[in-house]
Design a protein with these regions (language model features):
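C-terminal motif of bacterial Sec signal peptides marking the signal peptidase cleavage site
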Residues: 15-19
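N-terminal secretory/targeting leader peptides
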Residues: 21-125, 141-145, 149-353
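Signature of the catalytic double-stranded beta-helix
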Residues: 127-138
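Positively charged n-region of N-terminal signal peptides that target proteins for export
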Residues: 1-4
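Repetitive helical segments and hydrophobic/amphipathic motifs
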Residues: 11-12
Length: 353
């Protein structure tokens, strides 16, 4: 049944795309002999993912001398969440950026990247672990088995909890109705703090906050500003518990259809984008926080000492237990790999200081 629904979604999308671009063929030439590549992502215009996609578009069109056009589709234009993954898997879109929660619906082990306090507080350490570590190489294999090829793993910033009351300890979160992505692991993790985690579609989060249907939500700073969540919240709680990870993927069938020159071009561009998105998300986090404070000076920021954060880390173990119960030996192997990758990256980065 799921496969039938996915195929219906793909056919519908192909018709929509055909209406927009004049072609239903993945790399068909237009009347001007221009190939069209389709790029779908999960965020709104102006977001980190959108900036990544638009920079990719700019570089592809520049380096191909205009022989390739990249059409970018932000969240909701073709599909949301799991639907976007199916479009990529069936080659209805050629590139996509996915988050760990949606991919976890077909690759449970991918929830590794959502475990609380698994990553370093140092973004450079995390970047090195994601780019050079063994855990993402193993995840690459699992993605490929599901008809997705990861080209880049990147950070979009730490998740920040917003609320209408200060959160100093896990006890302060008792009964806290927090919007989370539809992930069983996230539900288990936030439940361990005493929360009432509630999955709500991203584009409906503001109205749910405004109508007091939920008490708070969790997202990177840029998203909190971009979606105006701060307008209906009073506190930003910087727990540094979770890094939001984006995965830039392509479709295997599409990839094999490319010439060697096109493959080389894409790989060179993704290397350039790795530095671009790292610098950009750091800049976005700072600029968007400043914008929030300028627009709402009354909002309060709560930061934590290592001792205060330790109380949350202790509770976070429930998320690890859930993950390992779900994924077994494969999950344990991946967790060990990621922890080793981060430790090695930490050592290497600190040596360079």
């Amino acid at each position: 049944m799921k496969k039938i629904l996915a195929l219906i979604l793909v056919v519908t999308t192909m018709m929509t795309v055909a209406g927009c671009s004049g072609t239903t063929n993945d790399t068909s030439a237009t009347s001007d002999d221009v190939k069209v590549w389709r790029f779908c992502h999960e965020e709104s215009v102006g977001s980190v993912q959108d900036q990544f996609a638009m920079k990719f578009k700019e570089l592809v069109e520049e380096k191909s001398d205009g022989k390739i056009r990249v059409d970018v589709y932000p969240v909701g234009q073709l599909a949301d969440g799991v639907g976007a993954i199916e479009l990529l898997r069936y080659n209805a879109v050629n590139f996509a950026i996915n988050n760990p929660a949606t991919v976890a619906t077909i690759i449970p082990e991918n929830q590794l990247l959502m475990l609380h306090y698994v990553f370093s507080d140092d973004m450079e350490v995390n970047r090195k672990a994601l780019n050079e570590g063994n855990a993402t190489k193993e995840l690459d294999r699992l993605y490929t088995e599901k008809d997705m090829i990861p080209l880049n793993w990147f950070q979009e910033g730490f998740q920040v909890v917003t609320s209408n009351f200060p959160i100093y300890t896990p006890e302060d979160m008792n009964g806290f109705k927090i919007r989370v992505m539809a992930s069983p692991l996230l539900i288990a993790a936030y439940s361990a703090y005493g929360c009432n985690p509630t999955p709500v579609p991203y584009m409906e989060t503001y109205s749910n906050l405004q109508l007091n249907m939920i008490d708070g939500q969790v997202n990177p700073v840029f998203a909190i500003e971009e979606m105006k969540f701060y307008e209906v919240q009073e506190y930003l709680n910087f727990l540094n518990h979770e890094v939001f990870i984006g995965t830039f993927c392509t479709n295997p069938e599409f990839w094999e259809s490319l010439t060697e020159e096109e493959k080389t071009m894409v790989m060179e561009i993704q290397e350039e984008l790795d530095q671009y998105v790292f610098d950009m998300q750091n800049q976005y986090s700072q600029e968007r926080l400043e914008k929030i404070l300028a627009n709402k000076p009354s909002i309060e920021l709560i930061e934590y000492t290592d001792e205060e954060r330790a109380a949350f880390q202790e509770k976070a173990q429930a998320g690890y237990d859930y993950y390992l119960g779900l994924t077994g030996e494969e999950g344990q192997k991946l967790l060990n790999m990621l922890q080793e990758d981060i430790a090695a990256a930490e050592k290497e980065v600190n040596q360079d200081i």
